[in-house]
Amino acid sequence: MTDPVFFAPSRRYTAAEVANLTGSVLVDSGQSDVSIEALAPASEGGANALVFVDGRRNSALMPSLRAAAVLCPAEFANKAPSSVAVLIHPRPQQAFALVGRLLFPTAATPGPMTSETGVSAHAHIDPTAHVEAGAIIEAGVVIGPGVSIGSGTVIAPNAVIGQSCQIGRDGYVGPGASIQYALIGNRVIIHGGARIGQDGFGFVGGAKGPERVPQIGRVVIQDDVEIGSNSTVDRGAMSDTIIGQGTKIDNLVQIAHNVRIGRNCIVAGLSGISGSVVVGDNVTMGGGVGLADHLTIGSGAKLAARSGFMSNVPAGEIWGGYPAQPMAEAMREIAMLRTMARARKQGKDNG
């Protein structure tokens, strides 16, 4: 549930305001003044809550909704109780997220963990670092020589920013995160415990065992990227590791040296991307995906969760399985194996 102790709504919105803000169509203009000050799942709802229904899986909830208003596609609009204001939108969840950011702005973007409004007296900042006015540096932060931090950026307690790193404006670095050898754009969110710019896993076989290869590249993180808690992004060996604009990376993701990820990609938790992989724009990776080194994943590809990739994926294709292959082929193989297993079992039972 949404606890107002943690997340108080910014203000009340009317159904008419929500329609205008999201580009939705309010079915009954007589419900323009319906008040909305909470968000809830359709299965729970609430007296002043906005909910959304976006597929046949949860459309069965429509007749029994308990909510102030619902965002839904046109085909479900006539199934809602008359007491619920219906807002028609082709992408209800997207509209719902927009309203959520307006109702609960502090939940949409991380902020200071303390009441600090400037630079804490308990932070260590090298005299050669440049912190723009309006940045917030909380207690326990360590900022090295030559660092630049833009206005509006929050550096949470005990984060460490290494020598000469640049962090743009209106960003966030979470508690205990560490950043080194990195150039970071504007509005970048790096959650607590993340590690950016450490050595890539570079070793070469030697007479006495593995020998370290110096990693002398950087990490470049473009604008509007988000990196989840305890994820790691290794710096390049000689070229850069690059995370493209708008890409969102979940918790516990490993990105190795020299990887290049395009724009607006989604990488779900527990995924691992090996060295020198190139990922195009608008790629989606499910949880636990593993990519072998030096692969190319084409723009718009979708990679199924828990899949292992040892070959390139063409643009726009859906792949999955282990080893991964086009999803239709993977499903056919699974169906064939099941058929063969059943036939074998029946043969044993009859014989």
UniProtKB/Swiss-Prot annotation:
Q: Which reaction does it catalyse?
A: a UDP-3-O-[(3R)-3-hydroxyacyl]-alpha-D-glucosamine + a (3R)-hydroxyacyl-[ACP] = a UDP-2-N,3-O-bis[(3R)-3-hydroxyacyl]-alpha-D-glucosamine + holo-[ACP] + H(+)
Keywords in alphabetical order, please: Acyltransferase, Lipid A biosynthesis, Lipid biosynthesis, Lipid metabolism, Repeat, Transferase
What is one term from the GO cellular component aspect held by the record?
membrane
**Keyword Phosphoprotein among record annotations:** no
Which residues of this protein are catalytic?
A: H257 (proton acceptor)
Its domain of life reads Bacteria
A GO biological-process term: lipid A biosynthetic process
User: Enzyme class, one word?
Assistant: transferase
- Signal peptide stretch: none
UniProt pathway? Bacterial outer membrane biogenesis; LPS lipid A biosynthesis
List the SUPFAM superfamilies. Answer: Trimeric LpxA-like enzymes (SSF51161)
Q: What's a Pfam family this protein contains? A: Hexapep
**EC annotation?**
2.3.1.191
InterPro entries assigned to the protein according to its UniProt record, in alphabetical order: Hexapep, LpxD, Trimer_LpxA-like_sf, UDP_GlcNAc_AcTrfase_non-rep
Q: Which GO terms describe its molecular function?
A: N-acyltransferase activity
**Per its database record, what is this protein's job?**
Catalyzes the N-acylation of UDP-3-O-acylglucosamine using 3-hydroxyacyl-ACP as the acyl donor. Is involved in the biosynthesis of lipid A, a phosphorylated glycolipid that anchors the lipopolysaccharide to the outer membrane of the cell.
* Similarity field: Belongs to the transferase hexapeptide repeat family. LpxD subfamily.
Complex formation? Homotrimer.
| Designated name of the protein | UDP-3-O-acylglucosamine N-acyltransferase
State the encoding gene: lpxD
